[in-house]
Amino acid sequence: NAMCDSRQLTTSRHPGTTLDVNAILHHDYLLYDTPGLTREDSLLTHVDDRLLKQVIPLKPLKPRVYQLYEASTMSLGGLVRLDLIGCEQVSCVAYFSENLKLHRSKQPKAEELWKKHYAEMLSPTIASLEEQQRFEHHGVDGKLDVVIHGLGWFCISGKLDEIVVYVPKNGNVTFRKAMI
């Protein structure tokens, strides 16, 4: 904006592009857009530019609700694998970009599915299948959020023995008390 002598704000889908503090007058309030911090554990930081419009939500997030009655796996493209183990009746609500495909499968067949369809049916990807890391949470009885840094989160409700999450090696996962 400074180079073209304009005071109009521009937007970018690329994270971390705000270079200076920008004051924005909105009705009777003054808002400040400030440079942010780049988080290396955010998958958004490691997504190729051509995938950003697929990963970043363009509309308000709409929850995608699944009722699960047996051990199941939720695959978010080839970016995230969520294994729900030892569940009888569990609700899984996904809050991610509408452009990322969510695939539900039986957990005992998840390994075979990922080996056979990774980077094809399970896409997009940002790392090889061998470059995945594992996060675990044991004993869920109630509501729990599984946050995938930079992408969104799953809200798990019910009782299950274990949650196992696989993400690319640069990503991170946080388990927290459900916020919704």
Residue ranges and their predicted role:
Residues 2-180:
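Helix-rich effector regions associated with P-loop NTPase G domains
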